[in-house]
Amino acid sequence: TIGFIIKMDSPGGSSMAKYDYEMALNYARSKGKKIVGHIDGMACSAGYALMALCDEVYFTNPHDTVGCIGTMCAMLTNKDGDVNTVTQERYAEIYADGSPYKNKEYRAAAEGNYEGIKEELNRLCADFQQMVRERRPRVTDDQLTGKTYDAGDVVGTMVDGQGDFKFCVNRVQQLAGVSQ
């Protein structure tokens, strides 16, 4: 194996996945492997995090979507004692005496106080943005604000160019110094 192509078509996922991606790709690099990202559709949020970690990134269609760099959280705000109006089931949370801080931020959010969760989101967002800045040094500040872009409009910053899968195979070979 001389390298890897990571094919991407994803709107995103868990921001925590970034850490696993980073460990896996750094391990491959430590073994001298080249990594090329290939976007065929969408590379947004956590999907773009994986692309940013690649040595080079190419897209199939200039209208493929990239970006959405940022973090968010969606949650149901059930509170202890809430009753489902359809089933009449009661939501209950019971905590051990030794766990007063367990889910504290989520319980606060159910009461309308989002500061604890927002603090965590801000930390994860800053870490995500820093990783993208390090791996894609020409990315603009505006491209780190959660916006999405047509891949053809961000060549040189978020992506390296246009190429099909065969092109990406050739790039891995070239980067690895293997004749074709």
List PLM regions with ranges.
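A mature extracytoplasmic/lumenal domain signature
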Residues: 8-12, 39-43, 163-169
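Glycine-rich beta-to-alpha transition loops that act as phosphate-gripper elements at the mouths
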Residues: 38-44, 143-148
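Small-residue-centered hinge/linker elements
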Residues: 1-33, 42, 48-135
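C-terminal long alpha-helix characteristic of the crotonase
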Residues: 118-138, 155-180
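Short, well-ordered alpha-helical microsegments
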Residues: 46-47, 151
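A local structural motif
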Residues: 34, 136-143
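Acidic helix/loop microenvironments that form the catalytic cleft of cell-wall polysaccharide enzymes
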Residues: 142-158
